[in-house]
Curated annotation (Swiss-Prot):
Its EC number is 2.4.99.17. This is S-adenosylmethionine:tRNA ribosyltransferase-isomerase. The gene is queA. It catalyses: 7-aminomethyl-7-carbaguanosine(34) in tRNA + S-adenosyl-L-methionine = epoxyqueuosine(34) in tRNA + adenine + L-methionine + 2 H(+). Keywords: Cytoplasm, Queuosine biosynthesis, S-adenosyl-L-methionine, Transferase. InterPro entries: QueA, QueA_dom1, QueA_dom2, QueA_sf. One of its GO terms (biological process) is queuosine biosynthetic process. PANTHER family: S-ADENOSYLMETHIONINE:TRNA RIBOSYLTRANSFERASE-ISOMERASE. One of its GO terms (molecular function) is S-adenosylmethionine:tRNA ribosyltransferase-isomerase activity. Pfam families: Queuosine_synth (PF02547). The keyword Zinc-finger does not apply. Transfers and isomerizes the ribose moiety from AdoMet to the 7-aminomethyl group of 7-deazaguanine (preQ1-tRNA) to give epoxyqueuosine (oQ-tRNA). The keyword Cytoplasm applies. Monomer.
Length: 345
């Protein structure tokens, strides 16, 4: 499928650089078939039915952007996938400096050695410490890896803002941004409504922001991300659906993991491992009935995903409406609630 079919023009002033305060005061565009309604995130409980189940991604963003030195020169790396207790795949710039065996100094006594170098600025780093000690060093010296379209340095506010309130599993280098809208009050209102919730973990990688550089989706390579869906969670989601409830994925990351764990029989199974699932129009959904998601970049794999889920022409029209109404886009922006369209137009 041609990538340019997923292109659109977005005014730069609609790219949110800070989140709504409070989180659940953001706007929500409801898209059901051909109809659209302009609402707020706080309206979500009334849009769901008792017995529905919300599926959240509980990954926690780590300070994955590091500034270091190689000799007299500087280098910046963004970790994107843990490959061992002391090893991470990363994107680096300038990448030409990262040759196997080279040592990067991030702080006094905190270093990493280049174990391997890949393509397109990728490399594998082996740190001088592992596990909790490595996480502590990242917390001390790393920066929150804000998306490249937020054109400002990260600051202390981002340590809280770019994290869901229920994050608990260290490992993401990008936030599951639909979840940023939830507050304790909103979760309580959903519980009072009779909507249950389940947690899955997909450690979002920096590859989520990589542009699609090819002209055809068949030629695009997705980066793998590590996820876990426990047997207990699978049982809870299957039970909710069997009782007539809808499965509502909070974010594309939760959706991608759910779809990775579900077969054509629509039974969700335990999952632990990597997924590089790439969802484009024509994909047959097995796990998810509704999707809450923010507004995505043109030509991105995530805009392709929502087009596959809710219909390509419907999403083009919905995005045109959102732009005309001044919705805020991307990670810190507003959100939408989409229903699955059996007719994928």
């Amino acid at each position: 499928m041609r990538v340019d079919l997923f292109d659109f023009d977005l005014p730069r002033d609609l790219i949110a650089v800070r989140p709504a305060v409070p989180r659940d005061s953001a706007r929500l565009l409801l898209v059901e078939g051909e109809s659209r309604r302009d609402l707020g995130v706080g309206d979500l409980p009334g849009l769901l039915d008792p017995g529905d189940i919300l599926v959240f991604n509980d990954t926690r963003v780590i300070p994955a952007r590091l500034k270091g030195r190689i000799g007299d020169g500087g280098v910046e790396v963004t970790l994107h996938k843990r490959v061992g207790p002391d090893a991470w795949d990363c994107f680096a710039r300038p990448a030409r400096k990262l040759k196997p065996g080279v040592v990067i100094l991030f702080a006094e006594g905190f270093t990493a050695t280049v174990a391997a170098r890949g393509e397109d600025g990728e490399a594998t780093l082996r740190f001088d410490r592992a596990g909790a000690a490595l996480m502590a060093a990242l917390e001390a010296y790393g920066h929150i890896p804000l998306p490249p379209y937020i054109k400002r340095p990260d600051d202390a506010r981002d340590r809280a803002d770019y994290q869901t309130i229920y994050a608990r599993e260290d490992g993401a280098v990008a936030a599951p941004t639909a979840g940023l809208h939830f507050t304790p009050a909103l979760l309580a209102a959903l519980e009072a409504r009779g909507v249950s919730r389940a947690m899955v973990t997909l450690h979002v990688g920096a590859g989520t922001f990589l542009p699609v550089k090819v002209e055809d989706t068949d030629d695009h390579r997705m980066h793998a991300e590590t996820g876990t869906l426990t047997a207990q969670t699978a049982e809870a989601i299957n039970a909710a659906r069997a009782a007539g409830g809808k499965v509502v994925a909070v974010g594309t990351t939760a959706m991608r993991l759910l779809e990775s764990a579900t077969g054509a029989d629509k039974v969700i199974r335990p999952f632990h491992g990597d997924t590089s699932i790439f969802i484009t129009p024509g994909y047959r959904f097995n796990a998810v009935d509704r999707l809450m998601t923010n507004f995505h970049l043109p030509r991105s794999t995530l805009f392709m995903l929502v087009s596959a889920f809710a219909g390509a022409s419907r999403m083009r029209n919905a995005y045109a409406h959102a732009i005309s109404q001044g919705y805020r886009f991307y990670s810190y922006g507003d959100s939408s609630l989409l229903s699955h369209a059996e007719d994928p137009r």
